[in-house]
Amino acid sequence: MLSVAQSSALFLLQAICILYITKLTIPTPVSEINLVRQSDCVCVPIISRSGTDYITCFNNCQIEPINTKLYNSTCTKMVNITLVRCNNEVYVMTLPNLVSNRSHSWEVLINYLLRFISAIIVYLLLSISKQGIFLFFSIVHYSFKFIKNKKSCNICGNDFYFIHIDCPKPDFTKRSDFHMMFYIILFLSLFFVVTHADDNVYNYYEHGDLTEIQLLDKEHYSQDFVSDGFLYNFYVENSHLIYDISNISTITRPVKHNEVTSTWSCDGSSGCYKDHVGKYNKKPDYVLKKVHDGFSCFFTTATICGTCKSEHIAIGDHVRVINVKPYIHIVVKTANKTDKIVIDEFNKFIHEPYYIKPITQIHIDQHDFLVTGSKVYQGTFCERPSKSCFGPNYITSDKTVTLHEPKIRDTFTHDREYIIDYCDYPSNSDLESLELTDMVHHSDKIYSPYDFGLISIGIPKLGYLAGGFCESLVSVKKIEVYGCYDCQNGVKISVTYESSDSCHTLICKHDSTTHRYFVQQHTTTLNFHSFMSKKDTIIECNQMRKALNLDESSETSVYFESNGVKGSAKEPVNFDFIKNLLYIDYKKIIFVFLVAIISIGIFLRSPYMLLSSILKFRKRRKVVATNRSEQLVMDDDVDVFIGPPS
């Protein structure tokens, strides 16, 4: 048997083992789990729809909303401009505009019809201005006499500077050369109005080893560009102005008014004034003669005078803008690579990762604002106490400034009571009298949404195309399509292919649309945007086919807008709309046919008149040449028969 000492030692050893095993099996506290997850957090905001609201989420990140409310621990509801703190950094997001679920094919059709209408308007305006244009041509032609020596026609004697078509020269409204120039201008105007793609007007310019694009600065707008066959997607994540501000004063509003000193006299205002100074050693703020005083005075009524003060509450800070700078974030995706362009200064060249031309300094009209919390108001603010501006009472440099104009009134009771309406002037302190802006204030900065128009971005040429090096087709492994048919959002097409040490070509076809892109070496995925008009359709990418059954349009599907630019610097005119116009249902075809019947006469008239002017021009030149030859022959005959005797 074990001794008592051995038993005690064995019991102690068992207890230690049990405690050690228990410690190993105790769950990690929730706070420790959160710390571990928070340490793995990468703050990347993701915007999505939840019912009728937009929310932004930071996966695996604990966030702190600044001007909105939490949706859950990692998501927050969105307002016009949403500020969220994640990992001690402030992220700015703008509420997306509601993407319409209208029919994309009808939208495209209406867009094409608007081009036709624009062409008709151009035709009518030029036709109405025809005589004025001829007069302008005549004035320009006449002005050449100051810079060019004129010539004289041997047949009709008229002066000319370049060419002489009409002989004799007619009125300027009937000149053949003016008609020809007019119809050339008219024809080219109609041609470019109809065929020039609205998304592609400002997009591409070639500059040596760069392809310059003009990016539309519109938040939550996704734009595709092709540079030397390679597809680039630019997504405008943020576009704001940031105002650095300085505090001018804290505007206050009087909310409670109290009597400080008071006295009365039967000797009128002067007597009351004298009594108050003698009693309190200060001048009274107000003087009131009672109508009834309860027989305080026998031969007159009492005069009351005294002082008062107001208790104030702060309603906001009057701030002034001292500096303005841009806040632009653009996400660029090409194949498996993602870059981010950050523009945070005006008049600054950016060379990496893309060449960015400087943005011109923005001049703002409003420099003074009132901020309270995250809200920003604008109006006319007081620099000194006045009734003609907002905030006559304020605190600046630890000094309280008030518009002290007490207002009291008689109670008309038989005593010396009176009512103090106010001591410090309370009006012009109501926030409802100011204009609430869509800006957001946080930490001595004001964030204001702003579109900078077109941003010039230079895409470096990759240099893979020498000798048709990229022409071989890449081997496609998988095709995925996300989105809806015949909707404003369109579809996102993701093609997975085999990685290679060299670049290759990817050709995808669906409906009447063909997408042709080069894929970079050592990449496996290419994403691009497109539109499909049918629910059931087939997409083919490098001989891999996939049947699609797309969903209907949904307002909750995608929150950003996309364009359909698929041109290049070498194709400034977009002719794809002609094919797409034919690939629509019979209802739209009938509608287009009716419009075309009305328009075709107008559009055919322009090339007809141009051709007529050219033929007339050539015919008159032949006539002039013939007349000149006959005149020379007649001159020779005259020299022979009526010349001087030999």
From Swiss-Prot:
Glycan-modified residues: N72, N80, N101, N247, N336
Keyword Iron (UniProt): no
Residue ranges, Cytoplasmic side: 141-176, 610-646
Topological domain spans for side Lumenal: 26-119, 198-588
Post-translational modification as stated in the protein's UniProt record: Specific enzymatic cleavages in vivo yield mature proteins including glycoprotein G1 and glycoprotein G2.
Signal peptide extent: 1-25
Keyword Zinc-finger: no
Superkingdom classification of source: Viruses
Keywords: Glycoprotein, Host Golgi apparatus, Host membrane, Membrane, Signal, Transmembrane, Transmembrane helix, Virion
Transmembrane segment boundaries: 120-140, 177-197, 589-609
Chain's role: Glycoprotein G2 and glycoprotein G1 interact with each other and are present at the surface of the virion. They are able to attach the virion to a cell receptor and to promote fusion of membranes after endocytosis of the virion.
Self-association and partners: G2 and G1 interact with each other.
Name of the protein in its database record: Envelope glycoprotein
Organism: European mountain ash ringspot-associated virus (isolate Sorbus aucuparia)
